[in-house]
A protein has these predicted regions:
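Positively charged n-region of N-terminal signal peptides that target proteins for export
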Residues: 1-7, 145
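Bacterial N-terminal signal peptides
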Residues: 8-19
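Bacterial Sec-dependent signal peptides at the C-terminal "C-region" and cleavage site
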Residues: 19-25
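Outer-membrane beta-barrel porins/channels
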Residues: 25-47, 72-75, 80, 87-319
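N-terminal glycine-rich anion-binding loops that anchor highly charged ligand groups
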Residues: 55
């Protein structure tokens, strides 16, 4: 038991050190940054290295092909309370469509509340908020029992307060994914995200004379991942390439390890999306095919290292 704990800690530290050298790029200035922060407690606890995973109600968000490999229906809900009045929430459901397909739907929201508004003289005039939403519809089809192809259709919205008006941008994008199950222990995954996604801003609704239509492109993200399952733990690793207009903006390595203490308790840690997380999952209710799991992760990122630890809580159920 002690040797297994040492191995778990050693791998966690190794993932942190290796990933730190490859995660120096900053893509926060590009649209959709809230989608690149991780969603549930399990996701951030594993460094968001879920390209080759097929486990939960938000499987399609990371790789739509994973929905075809789920044996049960899964639901997931999570919430992150971040520093600087930021928040991130998600809800998702994935359903198996017999005999060889799967479908999922998810909603992700990220926003900032209680922003101080000031007039041209610098005087306080109230508080405002801004937020982004993503609605994701996933579908996947499995072939020959080992290979699945999947597709996401996504609608993203972004609302910005300007004076007494609300400026809204809307984007429609597509994700394409592949998942290959080599055997019961090894899975490979690949996904291309944000194809054709770009916010369209119509400022002429606020500035009648000087307004225009402006497009803000999402970065296209290429991911490849592997998941390896052992007797009582599994290792997940992703490599990620972020591009914009065919130009490589940078690359990142995300990874995590998940250790099963028993059938009810799981420990995990990982580094990815410039966030280091460690946490656990506890299945506190089981009845036939129905089960409920509570997940928790403590996360540190580039912002939180000056403002304490982010606590991420999520719950998932299978039925």
């Amino acid at each position: 038991m002690k040797n297994k704990i040492y191995m778990y800690l050693f791998f966690s530290i190794g993932i942190f050190l290796v990933s730190s050298t490859l995660n120096g790029q900053d893509f926060a200035r590009f649209p959709g940054s809230f989608l690149r922060m991780g969603t549930t407690a399990r996701a951030v606890g594993l460094g968001s290295a879920l390209t080759a995973d097929s486990h939960h109600g938000l499987t399609g968000v990371y790789n739509p092909a994973g929905t075809a490999f789920l044996e049960k229906r899964h639901g997931t809900a999570g919430h992150q309370i971040l520093s600087l009045d930021r928040q991130l929430s998600c809800v998702g459901v994935t359903i198996k469509l017999p005999p060889t397909a799967g479908i999922g739907i998810a909603w992700i929201h990220g926003g900032v509340n209680r922003i101080e508004e000031r007039n041209s003289q610098g005087e306080y005039s109230g508080r405002i908020s801004t937020g982004e939403n993503a609605f994701v519809l996933s579908f996947a089809q499995k072939f020959s029992g080992r290979v699945a192809f999947g597709l996401n259709a996504k609608i993203m919205t972004h609302t910005l307060p300007i004076y007494d008006e609300k400026l809204s941008g809307t984007a429609v994008g597509v994700d394409v994914g592949l998942l290959y199950k080599l055997n019961n222990f090894v899975q490979f995954g690949g996904v291309v995200q944000n194809l054709n996604a770009k916010y369209q801003w119509k400022t002429n609704t606020i500035f009648e004379e000087t307004g225009t239509i402006y497009y803000d492109n999402f970065p296209v993200i290429y991911r490849a991942g592997i998941k390896t399952r052992f007797v009582n733990f599994q290792v997940l690793c992703d490599v990620e390439f972020v591009t914009n207009d065919s130009m490589l903006l940078g690359k990142r390595l995300n990874g995590g390890i998940e250790y099963y203490l028993n059938e009810n308790i799981t420990f995990r840690s990982g580094f990815g999306e410039k966030r280091f997380g460690i946490g656990f999952g506890y299945t506190y209710f089981k009845l036939d095919n129905f089960g409920v799991t509570m997940d928790y992760s403590a996360v540190v990122d580039e912002v939180q290292k000056f403002n304490g630890i982010t606590h991420v809580i999520s719950s998932s159920f299978s039925f």
